Curated annotation (Swiss-Prot):
Sites where the protein binds heme b b562: 83, 182
Protein name: Cytochrome b
Physiological role: Component of the ubiquinol-cytochrome c reductase complex (complex III or cytochrome b-c1 complex) that is part of the mitochondrial respiratory chain. The b-c1 complex mediates electron transfer from ubiquinol to cytochrome c. Contributes to the generation of a proton gradient across the mitochondrial membrane that is then used for ATP synthesis.
Gene3D superfamilies: Cytochrome Bc1 Complex, Chain C (1.20.810.10)
Single GO biological process annotation from the record: mitochondrial electron transport, ubiquinol to cytochrome c
Keyword field contains Mitochondrion: yes
Membrane topology (UniProt): Multi-pass membrane protein
Textual note on the cofactor: Binds 2 heme b groups non-covalently.
Species, as recorded: Vormela peregusna
Reported cofactor(s): heme b
Record-level GO cellular component terms: mitochondrial inner membrane; respiratory chain complex III
Pfam families noted in UniProt: Cytochrom_B_C (PF00032), Cytochrome_B (PF00033)
Gene name per UniProt: MT-CYB
Binding site for a ubiquinone: 201
């Protein structure tokens, strides 16, 4: 009898995607983050589902319902903090996954890369709306400030903002619709992730050398399933350590104060994973310019494949490009730090310089250095 795993229409898809999938023999731990992102997504959907059972999306009771989850629901506190810190783990894995793609030239699979950018935008939108739901001070003012940015769009801006708010300010209607969107978007992310995998399996995985590996493939199971389980263990241990020892480490203390439209917090700032984009937004004195820079800080990834001038795909054997890549990482860390600082000297100028450097590395320095490396190798 033929193995049902290989013949049944449903199990055949799973088999060809996760079991008998031919994978390059030399992919490193940097290729673990795809599966870790899958684990994060499932974890967020499950914890979110249980939170939604007890949460109420009404301005008068939202804050109290979150308190009720933490105090009165059995293991409610662990579900709430796993969900909150799970988002941080999600973004750590996302940034490392994108960084891996930039370093090893994975962007040369344009379909996979572009779906990845759409996924990044969708996850960021979901996380932003989730941050509004506890209805603390930072939730309310974060929602007000970020949605208000849309008013910079000429002609339709003001109408668009009021349409999103469902009124003339962030209120009950805004909270209810944000909850609805926050609930539905993870399932859209799930569908997009499936398309992401579909495109990836059309071409096969890239590998650290950037050289086609068709002549040297190994089955995904057991080699990479074991490797992914090890990565998953590290992820879960890190997440649980965070949840059980310092659950509020990455949060904002202001969010333990119920939302008050009459009292503005001294420093309005988003969660840590948005700080780099927030710093770029703040570094431009013009409102519309700031909004465009904010969008372009992520959208710039879409033109990276067009700016690939090197004869080699990966940066593995390109020391000058490696130096630039790590300068970019340092620059992003600087932007993250600046995003959390008040708008005053010297932080303003540091933020502006770091923002300029970010775009210059990606759009100017990378292509030029790649051409220089080609010439050095007489290619």
């Amino acid at each position: 009898m033929t193995n049902i795993r290989k013949t049944h229409p449903l199990t055949k898809i799973i088999n060809n995607s996760f079991i008998d999938l031919p994978a390059p023999s030399n992919i490193s731990a940097w290729w673990n983050f795809g599966s870790l992102l899958g684990i994060c997504l499932i974890l967020q959907i499950l914890t979110g589902l249980f939170l939604a059972m007890h949460y109420t999306s009404d301005t008068t009771t939202a804050f109290s319902s979150v308190t009720h989850i933490c105090r009165d629901v059995n293991y409610g506190w662990i579900i709430r903090y796993t969900h909150a810190n799970g988002a941080s783990m999600f973004f750590i894995c996302l940034f490392l996954h994108v960084g891996r793609g930039l370093y090893y030239g994975s962007y040369m699979f344009p379909e996979t890369w572009n779906i990845g950018i759409i996924l990044l935008f969708t996850v960021m939108a979901t996380a932003f709306m989730g941050y509004v739901l506890p209805w603390g001070q930072m939730s309310f003012w974060g929602a007000t400030v970020i949605t208000n940015l849309l008013s910079a769009i000429p002609y339709i801006g003001t109408s668009l903002v009021e349409w999103i708010w469902g009124g003339f300010s962030v209120d009950k209607a805004t909270l209810t619709r944000f909850f609805a969107f926050h609930f539905i978007l993870p399932f859209i992310i799930l569908a997009l992730a499936a398309i992401h995998l579909l495109f990836l399996h059309e071409t096969g995985s890239n590998n650290p050398s950037g050289i086609p590996s068709n002549s040297d493939k190994i089955p995904f199971h057991p080699y990479y399933t074991i490797k992914d389980i090890l990565g998953a263990l590290f992820l879960i241990i890190t997440l649980m350590t965070l949840v059980l020892f310092s659950p509020d480490l990455l949060g904002d203390p202001d969010n333990y104060i119920p939302a008050n439209p009459l009292n503005t917090p001294p420093h309005i700032k988003p969660e840590w994973y948005f700080l780099f984009a927030y710093a770029i937004l703040r570094s431009i004195p013009n409102k519309l310019g700031g909004v465009l820079a904010l969008i372009l800080s992520i959208l710039v990834l879409a033109i990276i494949p067009l700016l690939h001038t090197s004869k080699q795909r990966s940066m593995m054997f390109r020391p000058l490009s490696q130096c630039l890549f790590w300068l970019l990482v340092a620059d992003l860390l600087t932007l993250t730090w600046i995003g959390g600082q008040p708008v005053e000297y010297p932080f303003i100028i540091i933020g502006q310089l770091a923002s300029i450097l970010y775009f210059m590395i990606l759009l100017i320095f990378m292509p030029i250095i790649s051409i220089a490396e080609n010439n050095l190798l007489k290619w």
